[in-house]
């Protein structure tokens, strides 16, 4: 059985492992050393290792040696069939190893052009392709000189070698540029290496796309096209909001694909995946950056297969091992079978979260494929989101109906903006003091008002002997069969010390007991205990396809909603 080596197996690159096994080969992960002795570099390595938990297959694991020569000798003994990078930081080492072992790969002379952002654009300019003006600077003074000499206005600052939007700053003027440079020159890149040089580029305004290509001996084909939607933070960071698939080409997008082919040719890319990020403005398409590895974002094979009937790592192996299959796929028209969205979670401020209600909420979305957030033990600190590294996780949506995907996406975005405690909860909601006599009388009065409307379920902490309706506490909810015309929730003391994750799950379970056309009634004495209070309760009922009804004059404060 031949070995196939995956250098730095992370994110979507994890899919390589099963694909290698499916080709009757043995997967070998080559784990790279930390890029430096900084805390950030150690955290990056820890993140790489945590990704192994997502691999449900057997593989061999080897480690980079102290010198390149030792690493090369170790890999040579494996007699590998192919060496591929599993993520961006594995591209350089994988390319060097494959070249030195005379394996199919991208030419070593093009390594700078496919890994260093400034070199990419130099190569495009040399080939008379549209590129972005920019310069590598090593000081704030050098950046100011370049800014003034080029008569720049808005600029983008980014590390020369990094990935996604890590370390990227968008600056509206010189003052913002200077401030961002001072911050970045005192920081590290995505791999924990100190930033002693930065790339200053003119800003291109437009719509941002990804064109994923696959290359076989310099011939390219499209696998998927995505559109990015980002948000600029107050600090100038560039935050991913969501990515969506392009299922049919719109105006200007065919030209984008042609330009992507030209870029791959100019950079001398011969084999494997080409993850290219582009902008389209009034002048047409222009490259932002290209990465010779699979699309990131932890896109699992089942998610991608449902969207396009293929996934990149499998198609990548075709480009090396099965060129006939590659060329057969290349002749097929571009067709996606479902619409996909990757929603990145945006944390609005530094928080210490104690639970993640979104874990349970997300499962109820009709287009939900997966929610990827680390399990919170006791509590976990999350930084305000500034880039992809400070996003705590992602939600994956896929459905044949685009309207359903976008509806679920808008719900998730509304949670972020209006009821973030339903995403990551600090468990800080105040449990109001309740006048037992007053509120219990209110509950009985509400029940009596509801009797003309049909069957009633009371989910309650306190049972009422004088009410002839079905009553249950939270623990007994699983034993309730059937659906009711009216469901009234009277829970407060019993949920006061529960996690927001459990409270949200309990409310969702209760909402399922309401008939179509029936109503849910949540008084203030209950919704005060729900994450984000009334807004959180409203978000959950809207999520379950309830219509929020007008409040009724003279009734106690209450959320009323009807099931559609």
Could you describe each region identified by the protein language model?
Residues 130-132, 154-157, 171-206, 236-242, ...:
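Conserved ATP-binding module of the ATP-grasp superfamily
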Residues 1-109, 141, 389-390, 400-413, ...:
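ATP-binding N-terminal substructure of ATP-dependent carboxylate-amine bond-forming enzymes
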Residues 99-167:
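A conserved helix-loop-beta module that forms one wall/lid of the active-site cleft
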Residues 317-434:
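Peripheral (often C-terminal) accessory segments that flank ATP-dependent C-N-forming ligase machineries
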Residues 124-125, 148-170, 189-206, 211, ...:
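ATP-grasp fold ATP-binding core
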Residues 255-275, 281-282, 291-350:
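Active-site "cap" helix and flanking loop/linker of ATP-utilizing ligase/carboxylase catalytic domains
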Residues 502-516:
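A short glycine-rich, Lys/Arg-flanked "PGG" loop and its adjoining helix->strand segment in the class I
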Residues 517-524:
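Conserved beta-strand signature within the Rossmann-like core of class I S-adenosyl-L-methionine
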């Amino acid at each position: 059985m031949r070995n196939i080596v995956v250098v730095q197996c992370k994110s979507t690159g994890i899919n390589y492992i099963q694909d290698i096994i499916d080709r009757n080969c043995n997967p070998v992960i080559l784990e790279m050393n930390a890029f430096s002795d900084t805390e950030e570099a150690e955290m990056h390595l820890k993140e790489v290792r945590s990704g192994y938990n997502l691999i449900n297959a057997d593989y061999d694991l080897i480690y980079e040696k102290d010198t390149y020569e030792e690493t090369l000798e170790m890999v040579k003994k494996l007699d590998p069939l192919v060496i591929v990078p599993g993520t961006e930081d594995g591209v350089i080492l994988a390319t060097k190893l494959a070249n030195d072992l005379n394996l199919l790969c991208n030419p070593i002379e093009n390594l700078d052009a496919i890994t260093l952002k400034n070199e990419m654009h130099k190569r495009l300019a040399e080939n008379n392709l549209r590129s972005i003006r920019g310069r590598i600077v090593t000081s704030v003074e050098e950046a100011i000189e370049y800014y003034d000499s080029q008569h720049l206005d808005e600029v983008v600052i980014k590390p020369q070698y990094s990935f996604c939007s890590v370390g990227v700053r968008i600056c509206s003027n010189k003052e913002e540029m200077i401030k961002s440079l001072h911050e970045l020159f005192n920081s590290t890149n995505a791999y924990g290496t100190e930033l002693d040089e930065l790339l200053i580029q003119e800003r291109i305004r437009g719509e941002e796309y990804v064109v994923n290509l696959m290359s076989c001996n310099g011939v390219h084909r499209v696998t998927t096209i995505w559109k990015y939607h980002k948000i600029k933070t107050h600090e100038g960071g560039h935050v991913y909001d969501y990515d969506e698939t392009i299922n049919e080409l719109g105006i200007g997008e065919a030209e984008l694909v042609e330009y992507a082919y030209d870029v791959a040719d100019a950079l001398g890319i011969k084999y494997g995946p080409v993850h290219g990020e582009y902008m389209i403005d009034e002048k047409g398409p222009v490259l932002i950056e290209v990465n010779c590895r699979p699309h990131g974002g932890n896109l699992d094979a089942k998610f991608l297969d449902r969207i396009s009937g293929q996934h990149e790592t499998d198609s990548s192996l075709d480009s090396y091992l099965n060129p006939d299959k590659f060329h057969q796929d290349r002749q097929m028209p571009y067709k996606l079978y479902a619409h996909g969205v990757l929603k990145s979670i945006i944390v609005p401020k530094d928080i210490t979260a104690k639970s993640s209600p979104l874990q349970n909420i997300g499962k109820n979305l009709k287009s939900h494929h997966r929610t990827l957030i680390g399990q919170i033990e006791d509590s976990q600190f999350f930084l305000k989101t500034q880039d992809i590294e400070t996003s705590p996780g992602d939600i994956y949506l896929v459905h044949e109906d685009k309207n359903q995907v976008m509806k679920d996406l808008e719900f998730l975005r509304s949670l972020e903006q209006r009821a973030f405690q339903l995403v990551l909860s600090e468990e800080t909601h105040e449990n109001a003091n309740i006048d037992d006599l007053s509120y219990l009388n209110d509950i009985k009065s509400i029940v009596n008002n509801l009797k003309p409307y049909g069957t009633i379920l009371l989910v309650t902490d306190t049972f009422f002997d004088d009410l002839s309706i079905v009553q249950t506490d939270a623990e007994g909810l699983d034993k309730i069969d059937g659906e009711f015309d009216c469901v009234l929730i009277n829970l407060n003391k019993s949920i006061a010390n529960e996690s927001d994750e459990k409270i949200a799950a309990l409310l969702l379970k209760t909402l399922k007991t309401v008939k179509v056309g029936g109503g849910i009634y949540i008084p203030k004495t209950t919704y005060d205990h729900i994450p984000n209070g009334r807004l959180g309760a409203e978000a959950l009922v809207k999520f379950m396809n309830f219509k929020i009804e007008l409040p009724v004059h003279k009734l106690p404060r209450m959320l009323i909603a009807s099931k559609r």
